[in-house]
């Protein structure tokens, strides 16, 4: 039973994080509408997830439960690849290419900067 309790704890952490992530995404997309809203969500999310993933490896500030709650739950609900894909598909060809390029470049840049913040804080080479 202890193993089953740990799984239930993980599911609860993911669900609670997911709830908060979905609410935050909704609020940000209300503030910044359309493709720019989804781009903002995905770039911010990539930056934060980059920090979370590298923190758990190099600083250890967040810990395993935080990684589950924030990395899997919150970020999983906050970011949205599927909405980005649907929006891109619904645009004319040239604007779609711009949206796709911006999302890919800026989200990878977000991860890079999230990693860089953790690298600077840890003073260790990644």
From Swiss-Prot:
Q: Name one GO molecular function term.
A: metal ion binding
The record's subcellular locations are: Cell membrane
Bilayer-crossing regions: 11-31, 34-54, 66-86, 93-113
Keyword terms: Cell membrane, Ion channel, Ion transport, Membrane, Metal-binding, Sodium, Transmembrane, Transmembrane helix, Transport
Name any Gene Ontology BP term: fluoride transmembrane transport
Q: What does this protein do?
A: Fluoride-specific ion channel. Important for reducing fluoride concentration in the cell, thus reducing its toxicity.
| Full protein name | Fluoride-specific ion channel FluC 2
What is the species listed in this Swiss-Prot or TrEMBL entry? Methanosarcina acetivorans (strain ATCC 35395 / DSM 2834 / JCM 12185 / C2A)
Species classification: Archaea, Methanobacteriati, Methanobacteriota, Stenosarchaea group, Methanomicrobia
Give the gene name: fluC2
């Amino acid at each position: 039973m202890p193993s089953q309790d740990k799984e239930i704890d993980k599911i609860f952490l993911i669900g609670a994080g997911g709830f908060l992530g979905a609410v935050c995404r909704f609020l940000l997309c209300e503030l910044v509408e359309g493709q720019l809203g989804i781009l903002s969500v995905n770039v911010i999310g990539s930056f934060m997830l980059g920090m979370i993933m590298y923190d758990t490896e190099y600083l250890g500030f967040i810990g395993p439960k935080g990684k589950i709650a924030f990395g899997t739950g919150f970020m999983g609900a906050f970011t949205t690849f599927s909405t980005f894909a649907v929006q891109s598909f619904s645009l004319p060809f040239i604007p779609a290419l711009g949206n796709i390029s911006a999302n890919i470049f800026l989200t990878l840049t977000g991860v890079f900067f999230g990693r860089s913040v953790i690298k600077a804080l840890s003073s260790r080479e990644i």
